[in-house]
Amino acid sequence: MSASLDTGDFQEFLKHGLTAIASAPGSETRHSPKREEQLREKRAGLPDRHRRPIPARSRLVMLPKVETEAPGLVRSHGEQGQMPENMQVSQFKMVNYSYDEDLEELCPVCGDKVSGYHYGLLTCESCKGFFKRTVQNQKRYTCIENQNCQIDKTQRKRCPYCRFKKCIDVGMKLEAVRADRMRGGRNKFGPMYKRDRALKQQKKALIRANGLKLEAMSQVIQAMPSDLTSAIQNIHSASKGLPLSHVALPPTDYDRSPFVTSPISMTMPPHSSLHGYQPYGHFPSRAIKSEYPDPYSSSPESMMGYSYMDGYQTNSPASIPHLILELLKCEPDEPQVQAKIMAYLQQEQSNRNRQEKLSAFGLLCKMADQTLFSIVEWARSSIFFRELKVDDQMKLLQNCWSELLILDHIYRQVAHGKEGTIFLVTGEHVDYSTIISHTEVAFNNLLSLAQELVVRLRSLQFDQREFVCLKFLVLFSSDVKNLENLQLVEGVQEQVNAALLDYTVCNYPQQTEKFGQLLLRLPEIRAISKQAEDYLYYKHVNGDVPYNNLLIEMLHAKRA
């Protein structure tokens, strides 16, 4: 699709352009653009009466090219085409994301087209020359306004003081300018340039990947065990008589849970603003320009909402986006969670006689139930989530509770697991062979799928910072229907995506595909969680899992 001009812009160009040409005196002396810029800088410190008026210049602005053809699916090894072998797509829907195919970079100082890396970052030729002359000539400018002049392509020459200040603010390096006035800069910023290029390439890949949104993702190709599949099919008719809405459940287990102080009703704290953060009345749209907000923009829209770029120092030894640091603050204290769950299980076992002792599967269900309590507590106290109203909180949790459980289990194995063992939430290592010898084949197959995912994530060097990002991406799913504040959910998802991308590129530069590989694990986690839900439902209908626990309440709420 060829580039085109908006009718109003074109008419404005004709009007001002022809007027400027008609009124231009024929005897006016014209300087080269470079000379004209130098003269303007020289006059910057003079009083107003000595300044020549700057004629208004109209510029023909070409709108960015928009691709009409949606990008293809991105495979795990970076090619376009079909999904990885262990995934299949049952149905999908294209979302019309507009994006510039070439992702043309704009100068962070004035917004003009960049010409390359100059003194620390991508800038245009004009700002490059201005910065070099200012530093080499040791110029000192003054601002006749309030030192906050707007600097853009059409006004960058009006106030050199504010222009130079913005050059420094956006990251141009004084030490990169050669003092000997020779051409070329100091070649000590090569690693930073290389990392920046890699980051931009990853962003391009993300944008293309986000151009295709899967409306529904099927399960992993490996089918569920035949006995589980047939059992689920056979119980559908019998299950129609089960209550699928919220029912009055016996409060015994909930009362004893160390994570709650009252019978569980999934009640969330009232809607309140985050302390220290601006309210989320606006998030950028999903258009390409705002999907990765320019940290240097000073427009009102860009200043609203939470920006992970704040305080993000790319030159630190291990760069961590500020948003990820905030997400880490929300993480529960793991030893405390372990102690609470262990105390609960010991109390539970002591209240039973020898004949009523829990089976291996029953004990694992109790652990999962208490882990789910801790996950709900984590969500309730987390940044962004507590900004949502209770109804939206309920919908998000009911949608992803099983995925969060699976992700929690998998990360625990990646971080603490040992070869041939399963690391339980209680902090104990149990032999893998011991568990599979006391549970059914269907459960063992689910455990095997999870362990395969553990191996893949270990090979990616999956760490806690990436784990918290994936948790928030799972929790803030824009696929949930009837959300009142969908804009906030989408905005959080976009910002966490961007923070995760920056983190992986800056901290794992040797793994160029890590970001994409991590995102590809999310559909696999969802597929495993779906099978786990079906298995849990099957066991529940057979009477192996009681009603009075959070697992079953959430299971019924999701199926309602």
Swiss-Prot record:
Residues 173-188 are annotated as: C-terminal extension (CTE). PROSITE patterns: NR_LBD, NUCLEAR_REC_DBD_1, NUCLEAR_REC_DBD_2. Changing D180A: Strongly reduced nucleosome-binding. GO terms for cellular component: chromosome; cytosol; nucleus; RNA polymerase II transcription regulator complex. There is a cross-link at K289 (Glycyl lysine isopeptide (Lys-Gly) (interchain with G-Cter in SUMO1)). Residues 547-558 are annotated as: AF-2. Sumoylated by SUMO1 at Lys-289 during the hepatic acute phase response, leading to promote interaction with GPS2 and prevent N-Cor corepressor complex dissociation. A motif (FTZ-F1 box) lies at residues 189-208. It comes from the Eukaryota. A phospholipid derivative binds at Y535, K539. It is found in: Nucleus; Chromosome. Zn(2+) 1 binds at C107, C110, C124, C127. Residues 104-175 bind DNA. Residues 21-55 are annotated as: Disordered. CDD domains: NR_DBD_Lrh-1_like, NR_LBD_Lrh-1. A zinc finger (NR C4-type) spans 107-127, 143-167. SMART domains: HOLI, ZnF_C4. Orphan nuclear receptor that binds DNA as a monomer to the 5'-TCAAGGCCA-3' sequence and controls expression of target genes: regulates key biological processes, such as early embryonic development, cholesterol and bile acid synthesis pathways, as well as liver and pancreas morphogenesis. Ligand-binding causes conformational change which causes recruitment of coactivators, promoting target gene activation. The C-terminal extension (CTE) loop competes with a DNA minor groove anchor of the nucleosome and releases entry-exit site DNA, thereby promoting opening of closed chromatin. Belongs to the nuclear hormone receptor family. NR5 subfamily. This is Nuclear receptor subfamily 5 group A member 2.
